[in-house]
Structures are given as C-alpha cells and as structure tokens.
Amino acid sequence: MNGGNHTSMTELFILGPTEDPTFCIAFFVIFLGVYMVTLVGNISIITLIRISSQLHTPVYLFLNHLAFVDILYSTLVSVIMLMELLEHELALPVAACAAELCITVLFGSSECFLLAAMAYDCYVAICSPLLYSTLMSSRVCFLLLGMSYVGGCMNGWIFTGCLLNLSFYGPYQIDHFFCDFSPLLKLSCSDVSIIGIIPSISSGSIIVVTVLVIAVFYICILMTILKMHSTDGCHKAFSTCNSYLTAVTLYYGTITFIYVMPKSNYSTEKNKVLSEFYTVVIPMLNHLIYSLKNRDVKDALRKAIVRVYT
C-alpha cells in the first residue's frame, strides 16, 4: 500500500463482531453452528449432484458451483471471525487482508452472475423447452460459468486495486469482522472522493445488470406460466420460481445496502449485521432454499440413502 509520508502499515487488527467478552462465547457457538450447517449442507449437495445421474443437468451444474462458491466464501469469512471471537482481536498482515478482500468480492460477485445464469436456465426450460438441449448445451453452460468467475475476478481486482492505492495512518483497527472495503476506507488518510466510489460503481453495475437480466427472464417466465392450461405445470413452475426468487431477494437486498447505498445512511453496527447475514447466513440458507423444496433433489437423496442401506 502507498504509505505516503505516513508510517508504513504492516498489519491490521480486526476487532470482530463484538468487543464484549460476555457475548464472545455465545457468538462463537452460534457462528460455529451456522458454519458447520453451511459446510455439511453444501458438501452434501455437491456430493449428491455428482453421484446422481438424474441431477446431471445444467441447472444442477449451476447449483453445484453455487454450493462450491458458498463453501469457499463462508469458510474464508467464518474461520477468521471465529478466530477473532476466541482472541477478541486478530492481527492480519496487510497482504492477507488485501487477499481476503479480493477473494470475498470475487466469490460474492460470481454468485450474482451464477444467479443470473440460473435464471436464464429456468427461462429456457419453461419458455423454450424444445430448444433446451441446444440453448443449454455443455458449451453454453461452461461459457456462462467462465463468464461468472471472470466477472467476479474483475470486480475483486477493482476493490483490491483501490485498496492498494490508499495511504493509511494509525490506529490500524478495523471495526468489522473481516477485511471489507468500507471499514478499511475509514482508516485512510488519502483523498477518497474518487477511489471511495469506484467499488460502489463496480458492484452497483453488477447488481443492476444481473437484476435486470433476472427480472426480464422472470417476466417472460411469468407470462408463459399464465398461458399454461395444466394446473400441475403451473404449480411446479411457480414452486421453482418461488424458491429462486426468495434466495435472490435475500442476497441482492443485503449486498445492495452494503455496497451501493451511501455509507452515511447506516451505522457501523448495522453494516456488521448486514454483512454477517450475507456472508454467513445466506450461504447456509441457499442449499436449504434450493434443495429441500426441490422434488428432484429429494428423490435423488432418497435413492442415495436406499443405496447406502441396502
């Protein structure tokens, strides 16, 4: 990082979710439980998709990668947060902090693109079922996956590049539970009038574009569903859309508040709560929302259990 005329910063101290020792143990138990549920649930989804031939379809390929992203994302944030709760304050080298910021933004942005890709898959399946094998070929699927990760990488590099161009002065304490851009910005002695808004513009663009893509696809899906004469077909389509839209609303709602809304609109504590929700809780909810309400996944799980015990 550019140190300017100030003392060069070599490490940062992350204060964690709370500075009250009374709550540290309770928070540790809660977040450890949430992390274990996230880990076991998403690993189970990945394993089930791999071993069940009936789930070897594009939608479950995207779900497989969504689970993979959630595992890495929640692991990176949760492990550091649990260490903070045990030690009440965690010292991280600047390079490690920059790497954490880059990786969390990378996977968070990739998740936005994956959700948009899943919306496209649902659109093709409902609106153009006869062309599904052509429009969702292996080549198209891997292209969508590649674009998701490349888009995430670009946003991660933008955040990290802005961070590395800031100058800092002590005390080097981050009032947060991971190396997020907004708390780091408060430590800077640089002019942040431009650098401070670049990440918001970048993240805001990703959110707006992917939300518009999802909205267009689901308007088309809704119009197609309303034209259906089969009650069972309508019910199945609405059920699929309902679980997806629930996950989308939760995810996009929180990241919009954190990365797009003006920082003066909410307090540090509210920022912490929102960040905990989308970095720790949402990865746990995703596999529950997508899987437990999905008939194909439940059937595949039932068959897998039967194979194990017979």
From Swiss-Prot:
GO function terms (MF aspect): G protein-coupled receptor activity; olfactory receptor activity
Q: Which residues lie on this side of the membrane: Cytoplasmic?
A: 47-54, 121-133, 218-237, 293-310
Q: List the disulfide bonds.
A: C97-C189
What is stated as this protein's family in its record? Answer: Belongs to the G-protein coupled receptor 1 family.
Record topological domains on the Extracellular side: 1-25, 76-99, 155-196, 259-271
Instruction: Output the GO biological process annotations, alphabetical, semicolon-separated.
Output: G protein-coupled receptor signaling pathway; sensory perception of smell
PANTHER family linked: OLFACTORY RECEPTOR
The record's principal subcellular location, in a coarse class, is membrane
The protein's job, in short, is: Potential odorant receptor.
- Membrane-spanning ranges: 26-46, 55-75, 100-120, 134-154, 197-217, 238-258, 272-292
Q: Which residues are glycosylated?
A: N5, N165, N265
**Topology in the membrane?**
Multi-pass membrane protein
Q: Which segments does the entry list as coiled coil?
A: none
Which InterPro entries does this chain map to? Answer: GPCR_Rhodpsn, GPCR_Rhodpsn_7TM, Olfact_rcpt
Q: Please provide the record's keywords in A-Z order.
A: Cell membrane, Disulfide bond, G-protein coupled receptor, Glycoprotein, Membrane, Olfaction, Receptor, Sensory transduction, Transducer, Transmembrane, Transmembrane helix
Q: What is this protein called?
A: Olfactory receptor 5P54
Please give the GO cellular component terms listed in this UniProt entry: membrane; plasma membrane
Q: Where in the cell is it found?
A: Cell membrane
